[in-house]
Amino acid sequence: MAIRKYKPTTPGRRGASVSDFAEITRSTPEKSLVRPLHGHGGRNAHGRITTRHKGGGHKRAYRVIDFGRNDKDGVNAKVAHIEYDPNRTARIALLHYLDGEKRYIIAPNGLSQGDVVESGANADIKPGNNLPLRNIPAGTLVHAVELRPGGGAKLARSAGSSIQLLGKEASYASLRMPSGEIRRVDVRCRATVGEVGNAEQANINWGKAGRMRWKGKRPSVRGVVMNPVDHPHGGGEGKTSGGRHPVSPWGKPEGRTRNPNKASNKLIVRRRRTGKKHGR
């Protein structure tokens, strides 16, 4: 993937850039793996906003991704196409298995049309192959990692992300997360070799607010410019600094997002660096 920069023909085009989509080999998805996707605008079943800054955006169809890959062990698959997915930053690869089934997976860096991938404990260590962590050598970069055996991939699924397998001890493997956190995971959990492709996604300059609206992202307004009825930081005569430590619109202190009493915290060897108090 490469980034194509626009010429400054309009204010919205000045500095803006876009992916060249050179790796895409097909523009229409596999019909049997597409499901309807209804936008909810960040509302719950009662119509109340539960996630702010969402709404609008282009209509999308959901591509069913195989995050498990645990029921095709020993069955080789050929990469038929590399496709665009509007629901994620990574590209997706359409696999044609030898038994005739078709499935999508997240496309790792270096995977191209015509390559052959496989899954299972005896698979080779090459990008796109899926194995249990106990069968992957230390130091290998992996993505699409499970947190629980058989639970499906949960970690390192976005464009350019990867996790390094540091080592294995007894029934746990130590992983260095993209955030720098070191975490232990059951060695029976599966992971896909390689890092996620489309790493240049992070370098795209969107150029104008309208492109964010096309993606379904609404404006994020600072609490300090609101009225007191709308936010704890609102109000005041003229410009003010808020007058208190940063809080959410509901008065909760900003930052501390992790549950200190979570049972899985004991599996975290070293926390990510946040600039805030750890363990909160």
From Swiss-Prot:
InterPro entries in alphabetical order: NA-bd_OB-fold, Rib_uL2_dom2, Ribosomal_uL2, Ribosomal_uL2_bac/org-type, Ribosomal_uL2_C, Ribosomal_uL2_CS, Ribosomal_uL2_dom3, Ribosomal_uL2_RNA-bd_dom
Disulphide bond pairs: none
GO molecular function, one term: structural constituent of ribosome
Region Disordered: start-end pairs: 27-58, 226-280
A GO cellular component entry from the record: large ribosomal subunit
Recorded superkingdom: Bacteria
Compositionally biased residues, Basic residues: 37-58, 268-280
Gene Ontology BP terms: cytoplasmic translation
Alphabetical UniProt keywords: Ribonucleoprotein, Ribosomal protein, RNA-binding, rRNA-binding
UniProt xrefs under SUPFAM superfamilies: Nucleic acid-binding proteins, Translation proteins SH3-like domain
Subunit structure: Part of the 50S ribosomal subunit. Forms a bridge to the 30S subunit in the 70S ribosome.
Described purpose of this protein according to its UniProt entry: One of the primary rRNA binding proteins. Required for association of the 30S and 50S subunits to form the 70S ribosome, for tRNA binding and peptide bond formation. It has been suggested to have peptidyltransferase activity; this is somewhat controversial. Makes several contacts with the 16S rRNA in the 70S ribosome.
PANTHER family cross-referenced by the UniProt entry: LARGE RIBOSOMAL SUBUNIT PROTEIN UL2M, RIBOSOMAL PROTEIN L2
Family: Belongs to the universal ribosomal protein uL2 family.
Protein name as it appears in the record: Large ribosomal subunit protein uL2
Gene name of the encoded protein: rplB
